[in-house]
Amino acid sequence: MNKRLVVKNLGRQDYEPVWKAMHTFTDERDENTCDEVWLVEHNPVFTQGQAGKEEHVLAAGDIPIVKSDRGGQVTYHGPGQLVAYVLINLRRKNIGVRELVTHIENTVINTLSHFNVESAARPDAPGVYVDNKKICSLGLRIRKGCSFHGLALNINMDLSPFLRINPCGYAGMEMIQLHDLVKDNMTVENKAEHVEDVHPLLIKELTTLLDYTDIEYLTESSNHE
């Protein structure tokens, strides 16, 4: 069980049903429940973290705002962004929250290296950065020794909604995406047109770092009501 991971591709979904489904999964899981990673693209939404301050939303306009229970401040999710929710029993894996954050950041850093993109984490602000521009946001919640929420990696999306907020609470934080970094040198091997182009690499890096060897892949199109 400690080596087994279920990876679910949920396709494109609204935020709130998936958020509620994460709660249900975490509330109902027990020691025999497999760890899971959910891959999803969200319809446009701003999500406020537990510590989210209203002043960091500058002009939401027609994009809805959802008050979430993850760590961190406000961020934006939209089509073309790879969201991975990491539902792991940390006690069973014998890792702490800080170690999990480091593993997730290194998963993204290693994934980006496949595209010859150099990136790094920052001790003062969780996430992954390319030349101090943010390419991946990170926010987690722990309940009953289990993690939920996860990462949001910008692949090929409309970045303009980030200008309506102070991303993750940082005024003037510049956001960047993978497609813009590789579009002039794209090949069949390092294509970054769609989130699905990056899914296999991300999962490979995550399962290597977190030592999963028995991986089951599922595709779901349900709306998690």
Swiss-Prot record:
One of its GO terms (biological process) is protein modification process. It is found in: Cytoplasm. InterPro entries: aa-tRNA-synth_II/BPL/LPL (IPR045864), BPL_LPL_catalytic (IPR004143), Octanoyltransferase (IPR000544), Octanoyltransferase_CS (IPR020605). Keywords: Acyltransferase, Cytoplasm, Transferase. GO terms for cellular component: cytoplasm. GO terms for molecular function: lipoyl(octanoyl) transferase activity. It catalyses: octanoyl-[ACP] + L-lysyl-[protein] = N(6)-octanoyl-L-lysyl-[protein] + holo-[ACP] + H(+). CDD domains: LipB. Substrate binds at residues 70-77, 137-139, 150-152. The active site is at residue 168. SUPFAM superfamilies: Class II aaRS and biotin synthetases. Pathway: Protein modification; protein lipoylation via endogenous pathway; protein N(6)-(lipoyl)lysine from octanoyl-[acyl-carrier-protein]: step 1/2. Residues 31-214 form the BPL/LPL catalytic domain. Pfam families: LplA-B_cat (PF21948). The record marks 134 as: Lowers pKa of active site Cys. Its EC number is 2.3.1.181. Its main location: cytoplasm. Gene3D superfamilies: Bira Bifunctional Protein, Domain 2. It is an enzyme of class 2 (transferase). Catalyzes the transfer of endogenously produced octanoic acid from octanoyl-acyl-carrier-protein onto the lipoyl domains of lipoate-dependent enzymes. Lipoyl-ACP can also act as a substrate although octanoyl-ACP is likely to be the physiological substrate. PANTHER family: LIPOYLTRANSFERASE 2, MITOCHONDRIAL-RELATED, OCTANOYLTRANSFERASE. In the reaction, the free carboxyl group of octanoic acid is attached via an amide linkage to the epsilon-amino group of a specific lysine residue of lipoyl domains of lipoate-dependent enzymes. Belongs to the LipB family. This is Octanoyltransferase. The lineage of its organism: Bacteria, Pseudomonadati, Pseudomonadota, Gammaproteobacteria, Vibrionales. The gene is lipB.
